[in-house]
Amino acid sequence: MGKVIGIDLGTTNSCVAVLEGGKPIIVTNREGDRTTPSIVAVGRKGDRIVGRMAKRQAVTNAENTVYSIKRFIGRRWEDTEAERSRVTYTCVPGKDDTVNVTIRDRVCTPQEISAMVLQKLRQDAETFLGEPVTQAVITVPAYFTDAQRQATKDAGAIAGLKVLRIVNEPTAAALSYGLDKLHENSRILVFDLGGGTLDVSILQLGDSVFEVKATAGNNHLGGDDFDAVIVDWLADNFLKAESIDLRQDKMAIQRLREASEQAKIDLSTLPTTTINLPFIATATVDGAPEPKHIEVELQREQFEVLASNLVQATIEPIQQALKDSNLTIDQIDRILLVGGSSRIPAIQQAVQKFFGGKTPDLTINPDEAIALGAAIQAGVLGGEVKDVLLLDVIPLSLGLETLGGVFTKIIERNTTIPTSRTQVFTTATDGQVMVEVHVLQGERALVKDNKSLGRFQLTGIPPAPRGVPQIELAFDIDADGILNVSARDRGTGRAQGIRITSTGGLTSDEIEAMRRDAELYQEADQINLQMIELRTQFENLRYSFESTLQNNRELLTAEQQEPLEASLNALASGLESVSNEAELNQLRQQLEALKQQLYAIGAAAYRQDGSVTTIPVQPTFADLIGDNDNGSNETVAIERNDDDATVTADYEAIE
C-alpha cells in the first residue's frame, strides 16, 4: 500500500502533509511554500494556472481567476447570492440549481475547480515522496452538509485520488495537537477560523481516544468576511472622495481585495498599516484623463471597529458547543486556535475574555495543524499509526416526516459516527400500498422549520388492514458523515433507499439560526406537538368508535349514538381552530370525557352480548417522539398532503 496523504482543502489556502517515521510533516510545494493558495486561473492561451502563480496574475486576469470556490461547493444557486456578489469571476446556474463558474467560455463545476487544486497538491506530494500517490484523507468544515462532503469526495476522485476518509477540520487539528499526549486525560476546545468557515469542537482526549463531544459553527464566516469589511471601507471612502464606484471595475476590486487581505495580515502584528494603490482609477478633468490613487493609513483599532460584528459572531458557536456538551468554561483544559484568521488579535482577545482570561494554546501552527492531523488519520488508515481511535459526531439531527408535519428525529445531533438506527413502522390506513419517506435535517419540532434532504417511495406493499404491514426503516451514516436511508417491507422483502447526495446544502442563515430557533420556539413547538398528539388521539378514538359502531350497531340505541356523534363533531371542529394552551387543555378534557363515554357504552354492550366486537384505541404519537427504548407501541399514520399532492411518510412504529 502506497503513502496516504492528508489534505487540508481550504477556502483561501490548502496544505498537504504525510507521515514519515510515525510523525506528520508538511509537504513543501514546487514553489518552496508550505501552503498553496486555493486559486485556479486560465491564461490567454488556455493554459491552466494553480496556486501562487494564479494569485500573482489575478489582478490582470480577474474574470478568469477563481478563488474561494469552497463557498460554492455542494450549495444551491439561491443560497449563494451574497457570495456571488463578492467575486470577480462569472457564476452561472448549474445542474440541479447548483453554482458553476465560467472561465474563458468554459463552464466548470466547483468540484472541477477544487480538483485542480487537489491535483496540484497531489503532484507536489509525489515530487516530495518520489512515488505515485493515489489515496488521501481530506478535511472539511465540521458544519459541512452531506452534499458538501459528497462533493468534496467527488473532487478528490476527479483529481485521481481515492478519498479514504473525510475528517472534520477541528478534529484533525486536535489530532495533530494530541498525538504526543495520548495518555493525557483532558478536554480540548478547538476554535477553527479559516478563510471561509468557523468551527468549534470540544473533544475528550484520553487513553489514545479522541472523542468529539460537541461541534458548532458557522459555515460562512471566515477571513474572507474580514477582508470584505476593509474592501467596503476603501470603496466607500473612494466613492465619497472621487465619485467613482470601484465596485464596477473588476480589476480594481481585485486590487482592493488583495490589498485588504494584506492589510489584515499586517495588522495582526503591527498597530498600523498603509494601503497604497496607485492608478486605481481614471477620472476626466477638463476633458483630459487624470489618474486616481489610494494611499490611506488603517489602524488596528479602526479595523477592529469595522469588524466588531464579525468578532462577536465568533463567540456564539463556543457557547453552543459548551451547552451541547454540558460543560462550563472552567471544565475546558486547553483552547486551541487554528486557521489563519485566528491570528487576528481581536479574535484572540475575544476568546480569552470569554474564558475568563484563560490563555489559548498557541503552540501549534494554525495554517498547518489541520493538514498534520489529516496525515495522522491517513497513517491510522494505512496502518502506520497504532492505538489511536477517532470518534467524530454529526452536527445536526436527522429524521423523517411523520403525522401532522412533525419532524421525528432518528439520529440526534452530536451522535458519534459511524452509526445506524433502525425502526419498524406500520401503515395507518387500510389498504395502503405505498409510503413516501421524507428525510430531513435540523432541530425544530415541525417539518416546515427544518431542511429537506430528499424523498423516496416504497411501493408494492400488499393491501392489508392498518397496522399489519411491517416497514423497516434504516438510517446509516458512514465515517465520512454521509447518509444512506433505506426502507424494506418485511412481508415482501421489497426495498428502496436513497443516498443523500442532493447538491443543495444549508444556507448560512439556516445553520446559524437552526439551533437558536430550536430554543427560541421551544414553547410554541411544544404546544404544536401537544396539539398534533391530541389530534392523533382523537382520530384513533373516532376510528375505534366508528369500527365498534359498524360491528355492533344493533346494540346501541339512537339516543346513545346521537350525543356521541355530536361530541365527536364538536371536538373535530375545536381541533381545527385551537391556538393556545388554554384551548388545548379544554379540548383535552373533552377528549377524556368522550373516552369515558365510549368506555361506558362498550362495557354496557359487553353486558348485553358477550360477543361484541371492539377496536382498541391505539397508543398515541407521543410515544414516538419520546423514549424509543421503552418497549411500548408507537403510533403514526399515513395521510394525504394536499399541498404537494404526495403521500407523506407517516407510520405506526411497532418495534
UniProtKB/Swiss-Prot annotation:
GO molecular function terms noted in the UniProt entry: ATP binding; ATP-dependent protein folding chaperone; unfolded protein binding
Highest taxon in the source lineage: Bacteria
Induction comment from the UniProt entry of this chain: By stress conditions e.g. heat shock.
Positions bearing Phosphothreonine: T197
Xref: InterPro entries: ATPase_NBD, Chaperone_DnaK, Heat_shock_70_CS, HSP70_peptide-bd_sf, Hsp_70_fam
Role according to the record: Acts as a chaperone.
Family: Belongs to the heat shock protein 70 family.
Listed name of the protein: Chaperone protein DnaK 3
Annotated source species: Synechococcus sp. (strain ATCC 27144 / PCC 6301 / SAUG 1402/1)
